[in-house]
Amino acid sequence: MRIILLGAPGAGKGTQAQFIMEQYGIPQISTGDMLRAAVKAGTPLGLEAKKVMDAGQLVSDDLIIGLVKERIAQDDCVKGFLLDGFPRTIPQADAMAANGISIDHVIEIDVPDEEIVKRMSGRRVHPGSGRVYHVVFNPPKVEGKDDVTGEDLAIRPDDEEATVRKRLGIYHEQTKPLVEYYGKVAAAGNTQYHKFDGTQSVAAVSAQLASVLK
């Protein structure tokens, strides 16, 4: 079972990815982890990627496709895999298809921007322990204070509203077009496309996922 997971940052992809991995025994492949592993292992592609990253440049699509092909040929991918954070653009999706990497299911977790802003900009963290709160969904007993130590809570830079909106803008510009792209691939009978309402409870989304990923 080869799966691509699509959705904006903060849509809940990570939680559902965990569910899919545990339920179906397939690894989650993230390009970041894959790059780090290849660099650490010193593979030819890893060394090439390291050179590019050390120069502060972006790793090319060709190089990443090479790494994906290398990674999915490993034993733990026999039953399939879950691609996370790749492809991000239509050229990357085209390159995957050109390299014969077929996909069985494309899953989109759809959450409106304003809901994502509410979710992410409401997060508060206790820097000392990493405990995470949310002003709406999981508030601390005393506003702005950690339940255990009473110390101040902080907002991670990634969760600042302006940062969240910027990341959403990039998602809509680069990755959202993949929704239409894979819709066409599915219409041609070459994959299955499923869209889920990510504003539902985690359990509800997981149950719906399980019903289509039989």
Swiss-Prot record:
**Keyword presence, ATP-binding:** yes
* Single Gene Ontology BP annotation: AMP salvage
- The EC designation for this entry is 2.7.4.3
What organism does the UniProt record list as the source? Shewanella sp. (strain ANA-3)
Q: Where does AMP bind?
A: T31, R36, Q57, L58, V59, G85, F86, P87, R88, Q92, R156, R167
| Keywords associated with the record | ATP-binding, Cytoplasm, Kinase, Nucleotide biosynthesis, Nucleotide-binding, Transferase
By its UniProt entry, which HAMAP family does this protein fall under?
Answer: Adenylate_kinase_Adk (MF_00235)
Q: Name one Pfam family in it.
A: ADK
Q: Which cysteines are joined by disulfide bonds?
A: none
GO MF terms, alphabetically ordered: adenylate kinase activity; ATP binding
Work out whether the entry's keyword set contains Aminoacyl-tRNA synthetase.
Answer: no
Where are the annotated segments for NMP? 30-59
- Which InterPro entries does this entry report, sorted A to Z? Adenyl_kin_sub, Adenylat/UMP-CMP_kin, Adenylat_kinase_CS, Adenylate_kinase_lid-dom, P-loop_NTPase
Task: List the SUPFAM superfamilies.
Answer: P-loop containing nucleoside triphosphate hydrolases
**Could you describe the subunit structure of this protein?**
Monomer.
The written remark on domains in the entry is: Consists of three domains, a large central CORE domain and two small peripheral domains, NMPbind and LID, which undergo movements during catalysis. The LID domain closes over the site of phosphoryl transfer upon ATP binding. Assembling and dissambling the active center during each catalytic cycle provides an effective means to prevent ATP hydrolysis.
Name-wise, this protein is Adenylate kinase
Q: Which lineage is the organism of this entry classified under, starting from the top rank?
A: Bacteria, Pseudomonadati, Pseudomonadota, Gammaproteobacteria, Alteromonadales
- Gene for this protein? adk
